[in-house]
Amino acid sequence: MSHAEDNAGTRRDFLYHATAATGVVVTGAAVWPLINQMNASADVKAMSSIFVDVSAVEVGTQLTVKWRGKPVFIRRRDEKDIELARSVPLGALRDTSAENANKPGAEATDENRSLAAFDGTNTGEWLVMLGVCTHLGCVPMGDKSGDFGGWFCPCHGSHYDSAGRIRKGPAPRNLDIPVAAFVDETTIKLG
């Protein structure tokens, strides 16, 4: 009887297969922790998105919250702020990109930088931006500061308008807008 006709497994074949299976299990057990450690930890997942109640924010005022370790400005603009921002021609801006994570590649018009309400209408009333100067990472002052009625960074003199667009000073870009949306009439979800 030749070896090719012998279909019954021998003890040696069993040991080969058992050793190979054990090797696969041991390798998987060793590699799994290395792969699993690349997943986000619970504290990082908890910081990835927050809900902000804006029911107490009056027209013409601003709320600052901390998200992912950075300040976020939430301003409820009045009609004067909205009209001022919408009257600026795109060609007069240093940075013509909206820098809006909700609208990648959009132009820096006021409509592309403001946040739509829960019903989807965008009156320009709400503006949500990271409160970090795009020059060197300082925190600009709000309350209609600076030469353009928006924010002013006292560190190096950057002036932002009422839509958070850079108008004067060394900052190269508009203030960044994070992923944000209303989840109901009075709550904004960041992230």
Curated annotation (Swiss-Prot):
Its EC number is 7.1.1.8. Keywords: 2Fe-2S, Cell membrane, Disulfide bond, Electron transport, Iron, Iron-sulfur, Membrane, Metal-binding, Translocase, Transmembrane, Transmembrane helix, Transport. Residues 94-189 form the Rieske domain. Binds 1 [2Fe-2S] cluster per subunit. InterPro entries: Rieske_2Fe-2S, Rieske_2Fe-2S_sf, Rieske_Fe-S_prot, Rieske_Fe-S_prot_C, TAT_signal, TAT_signal_bac_arc, Ubiq_cytC_Rdtase_Fe-S_su_TAT, Ubiquinol_cyt_c_Rdtase_Fe-S-su. The chain crosses the membrane at residues 18-35. It is an enzyme of class 7 (translocase). Changing residue 155 to D/G/S: Photosynthetically incompetent. Its main location: membrane. Gene3D superfamilies: Rieske [2Fe-2S] iron-sulphur domain, Single helix bin. PROSITE patterns: RIESKE (PS51296), TAT (PS51318). It catalyses: a quinol + 2 Fe(III)-[cytochrome c](out) = a quinone + 2 Fe(II)-[cytochrome c](out) + 2 H(+)(out). GO terms for cellular component: plasma membrane. It comes from the Bacteria. GO terms for molecular function: 2 iron, 2 sulfur cluster binding; metal ion binding; ubiquinol-cytochrome-c reductase activity. It is a single-pass membrane protein. Changing residue 135 to L/P: Photosynthetically incompetent. Disulfide bonds join 138-155. Component of the ubiquinol-cytochrome c reductase complex (complex III or cytochrome b-c1 complex), which is a respiratory chain that generates an electrochemical potential coupled to ATP synthesis. The Rieske protein is a high potential 2Fe-2S protein. The main subunits of complex b-c1 are: cytochrome b, cytochrome c1 and the Rieske protein. Belongs to the Rieske iron-sulfur protein family. This is Ubiquinol-cytochrome c reductase iron-sulfur subunit. It comes from Rhodobacter capsulatus. The lineage of its organism: Bacteria, Pseudomonadati, Pseudomonadota, Alphaproteobacteria, Rhodobacterales. The gene is petA.
